[in-house]
């Protein structure tokens, strides 16, 4: 059972003095079904066709490669995987079947509408720029944000502590007046070491030592 705070829980967060909201994309604004299906099912099927092998063998090969790179910048790099697998990964992501799987999470637009005028919103994602562009074609959220940051371009991923120091310098913001909204605990932990507070979003999370909400809708309803 999740310990995330829900709409029925009395929880108020004071936004007084808060200037900057750093927001993750996948798992916070967008549902992760698109990415999960793409890497776990779609790419193995295409790899099986390319190599003329059975699907189970293709799944074993591709998932082994993915797991080996998980947590570093290659894992998010479409060009890396195109070269590694011999597939045009960007083209596969642009197929109609895949584009139709990109979906907004509950409360995403309402949250952005509510805060983009009086707070500095920054999209901070591990997604490759090509992946970000594909998703922004489906849901053009760019104008809500002061800047769209892809970790790959800072040569570190969000799981790595140096990323957050480099990001702070790039944005020129005070982390004491900022908050991160994330769905990945490893990213929250690394951000903490740079002095950045976080809110966890996710219906399966189970952390008692920090604010945790099922989605942006329940988080927004808790704010003063």
Residue ranges and their predicted role:
Residues 2-21, 113, 128-129, 133-224:
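Asp-based, Mg2+/Mn2+-dependent phosphohydrolase catalytic module
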């Amino acid at each position: 059972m999740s310990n995330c705070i829900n709409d029925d829980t009395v929880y108020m967060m004071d936004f007084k003095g808060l200037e900057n909201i750093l927001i993750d994309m996948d798992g916070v604004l967008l549902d992760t079904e698109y990415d999960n299906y793409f890497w776990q099912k779609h790419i193995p099927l295409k790899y099986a066709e390319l190599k003329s092998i059975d699907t189970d063998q293709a799944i074993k090969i591709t998932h082994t490669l993915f797991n080996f790179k998980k947590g570093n910048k290659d894992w998010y790099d479409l060009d890396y995987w195109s070269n590694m697998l011999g597939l045009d990964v960007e083209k596969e992501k642009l197929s109609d079947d895949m584009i139709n799987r990109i979906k907004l999470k509950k409360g995403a637009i309402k949250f952005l509408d509510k805060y983009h005028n009086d707070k500095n919103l920054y999209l901070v994602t591990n997604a490759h720029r090509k992946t970000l562009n594909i998703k922004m074609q489906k849901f053009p959220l760019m104008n809500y944000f002061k800047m769209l940051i892809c970790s790959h371009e800072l040569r570190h991923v969000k799981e790595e502590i140096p990323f957050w120091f480099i990001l702070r310098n790039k944005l020129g913001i005070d982390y004491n007046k900022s908050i991160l909204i994330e769905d990945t605990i490893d990213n929250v932990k690394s951000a903490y070491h740079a002095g950045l507070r976080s809110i966890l979003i996710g219906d399966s999370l189970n952390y008692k030592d920090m604010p945790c909400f099922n989605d942006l809708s329940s988080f927004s309803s808790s704010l003063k």
